[in-house]
Amino acid sequence: MTPLSSPLSQYWQTIVERLPEGFTETSLSVQAKSVLTFSDFALDSVIAHPEWLAELESASPQADEWRHYAGWLQEALAGVCDDASLMRELRFFRRRIMVRIAWAQTLSLVDDETILQQLSHLAETLIVGARDWLYAACCREWGTPCNPQGVPQPLLILGMGKLGGGELNFSSDIDLIFAWPEHGETRGGRRELDNAQFFTRLGQRLIKALDQPTMDGFVYRVDMRLRPFGDSGPLVLSFAALEDYYQEQGRDWERYAMVKARLMGDNDDAWSRELRAMLRPFVFRRYIDFSVIQSLRNMKGMIAREVRRRGLKDNIKLGAGGIREIEFIVQVFQLIRGGREPSLQSRSLLPTLDAIAALHLLPENDVAQLRVAYLFLRRLENLLQSINDEQTQTLPADDLNRARLAWGMKAENWPQLVGELTDHMANVRRVFNELIGDDEADTPQEEERSEPWREVWQDALQEDDSTPVLAHLADEDRRQVLTLIADFRKELDKRPIGPRGRQVLDQLMPHLLADVCSREDAAVTLSRITPLLAGIVTRTTYLELLSEFPGALKHLIMLCAASPMIASQLARYPLLLDELLDPGTLYQPTATDAYRDELRQYLLRVPEEDEEQQLEALRQFKQAQLLRIAAADIAGTLPVMKVSDHLTWLAEAMIDAVVQQAWTQMVARYGQPAHLDERQGRGFAVVGYGKLGGWELGYSSDLDLIFLHDCPMDVMTNGEREIDGRQFYLRLAQRIMHLFSTRTSSGILYEVDARLRPSGAAGMLVTSADAFADYQQHEAWTWEHQALVRARVVYGDPQLTSQFDTVRRTIMTTARDGKTLQTEVREMREKMRAHLGNKHRDRFDIKADEGGITDIEFIAQYLVLRYAHEKPKLTRWSDNVRILELLAQNGIMDEHEAQALTVAYTTLRDELHHLALQELPGHVAQTCFSKERALVQASWRKWLVAV
């Protein structure tokens, strides 16, 4: 065993006085001194439990002792009588065994592969032990869940990721998916439950037993987000529901996750075999699947973006050449060829590497280097985490922990360890890049083209000197370009740019200037790009991105030239530069029905319990998607209707995620309202009004929302901190508003306006469905019924959605006096015009002035409220374009008039989108859109001016 280094020997002297009673420096073995000096976790544990230290000193941990874990745990749980004592024993057992593993790992008593195996078996033992105890307890309370034939149904648990692969790290969380075989009911209990209810309750208790922090700590952080539909899906699914999901909706990234999926516990029964057989075709295709390569390229981009986004410079998992890249390399071959090559279907990485070598899919030397690098990195990761039982992969900055890791990795000192680490990660990165490929470097022609601009940039040439390269520009533009360059250089002198940053900037600027100054609008484009560059000059990684990826630089120039809004966004949030790397996604926004899934995948990389990171991730996702929508808009690949569709679907995905987060936080604090025990869903709905309700969001639109619940009076929550059920929903809505409006370094998510709720700002933030119906029928003004025309549920369970739709339909199909309605709608419009109309007589406000968008909206709303009692089909849609279509189809409006209003409406909205991209207000010269305005005004007079 390597003797302790000098810094660690000195640190040992500070430990001696903290040793448990009965232990002295002379009574301890060299091994004990080494472990207790290395790991604060082990030291704190044996101080609390001195008998563990005596046990370890008398008999060292063995390589195969994982075989005894199940028996040891069974003994520990023999006297458990309730959930609280179960939680205590699970935590006690986990800590005791983790100390044994830390001891064996620190002293290299067993090899590193065995350590991974022991960590994984420990987690599996605790999961299965807790499940089995709780299953029996739930059966005593509610009966045994059975299928219609009376066959008992088990809870099957899929361990995902490193747990499934038998490669768990020291302080890992665990990713699980719960399933049960067949529908039915419980039998033999005090009350019958549907199987779905039984297994949901069992799953909730199991997560609590493992995950909830107590005075004894926790067992594992449990992450359930890999299940179908993530947090918005059921906690536990039947086999049939799982099969439907993976056949119909399973995504590529879910295939990757399922490669490592493994059933926990004794899993050779008929149900387990059925589940494995069902999942196998989804994961491994029968043919050689080269379609996966593009998805893997996207994954590679995600890795790079995450490293930049989180500043993971010294991260041995996510950094370049880290553990994630080795896993990625192996998965490439598993997913492309695994269906044809059974040897590639292993859940574990090292056996799969052996199969890759045997199949000659990678050179033998590459495989050998990957294996050595993987074991080196995994040992370093585990040692790092075992210091404080902390989930981290970032190398320490303090001398003590650096000395610990150098000693644990058998290096002479920290620089030697860093050198070895750098070599291993460089080998991994080389194979990684060769497998997927990077952008092509600059061609000699591009280098030659940029050379004159090197002088302009580095030598600060005067106007006369630079005339040849700027000859195509007008005199004023040429002077402006040179002034911008000179001002930018002066600005740089005020910034603390290091040598590396200056070097990269000097490499980048000639190429950037060559591209920008070849344009006729060079001065305008450069004026938009230099603020962005000034913002990132101290963040070398972004300069390197633009320097090393010429394609990204070209897209940056094109987008900034086209839109100051995009330039401003990129300057404010430089992490968006990552989106420029892949033109395939930059100009092709996410499919309208895929935003929720993309966001779910994005959020999986963020710890569920880290609220700050969750808030940042939501905002960053929205900004990236907005950039892609705007880029497609500028490129002309999205018409105005589709721009709004994408912006609306994006907003709905954000609402879904925010409600999920708020719900999770509230339930963790208070439990859920007890009436939900008897029904599916959450008894909560979010209704979108205005542009959101009408599928007409713009780039900077706020969200008009109201919140509904269906909680009866006198219902309490079922958590340890009980509160009134209606108070729960009020706090939930307040939490949702907070998550939307909190300003982080990435800004706010959306401005939210909830004043359209019953009684406006004076009313309760969240309303019961019954109270909402009563208000609409007896108290609401006509303008509130107009608003209801453009309202729809954007988040909610089917039961509440149906209730809202019924109320909306009832209100809209109520017979009204035509003259009274006409007068009230017209007077409301006149009030709005007086309040919001354009104050500049020489300008036309596209939205608020006569003949503008609001007039078209009022015409549509008036006609729905006027005629829906005769033509109920008019209530079907909430957007103006389809309402106009319905009016024509139902004989209310002439088809030619409806079509003309639709064209006018989309034309005006298109102009608003483009003004937003130019960061211009929503008004134009009075001479613009005269044809459209005249048409709208004629229609207004026809329908809303009293005859």
Swiss-Prot record:
The gene is glnE. NCBIfam families: PRK11072.1. Gene3D superfamilies: 1.20.120.1510, Beta Polymerase, domain 2, Glutamine synthase adenylyltransferase GlnE, Nucleotidyltransferases domain 2. One of its GO terms (molecular function) is [glutamate-ammonia-ligase] adenylyltransferase activity. Coiled coil: none annotated. Residues 1-440 are annotated as: Adenylyl removase. PANTHER family: BIFUNCTIONAL GLUTAMINE SYNTHETASE ADENYLYLTRANSFERASE_ADENYLYL-REMOVING ENZYME, GLUTAMINE SYNTHETASE ADENYLYLTRANSFERASE. Its EC number is 2.7.7.89, 2.7.7.42. It catalyses: [glutamine synthetase]-O(4)-(5'-adenylyl)-L-tyrosine + phosphate = [glutamine synthetase]-L-tyrosine + ADP; [glutamine synthetase]-L-tyrosine + ATP = [glutamine synthetase]-O(4)-(5'-adenylyl)-L-tyrosine + diphosphate. This is Bifunctional glutamine synthetase adenylyltransferase/adenylyl-removing enzyme. Involved in the regulation of glutamine synthetase GlnA, a key enzyme in the process to assimilate ammonia. When cellular nitrogen levels are high, the C-terminal adenylyl transferase (AT) inactivates GlnA by covalent transfer of an adenylyl group from ATP to specific tyrosine residue of GlnA, thus reducing its activity. Conversely, when nitrogen levels are low, the N-terminal adenylyl removase (AR) activates GlnA by removing the adenylyl group by phosphorolysis, increasing its activity. One of its GO terms (cellular component) is cytosol. InterPro entries: GlnE, GlnE_rpt_dom, NT_sf, PII_UdlTrfase/GS_AdlTrfase. The keyword Phosphoprotein does not apply. Pfam families: GlnD_UR_UTase, GlnE. Belongs to the GlnE family. GO terms for biological process: regulation of glutamine family amino acid metabolic process. Residues 450-947 are annotated as: Adenylyl transferase. SUPFAM superfamilies: Nucleotidyltransferase, Nucleotidyltransferase substrate binding subunit/domain. It is an enzyme of class 2 (transferase). Keywords: ATP-binding, Magnesium, Multifunctional enzyme, Nucleotide-binding, Nucleotidyltransferase, Transferase. Its cofactor is Mg(2+).
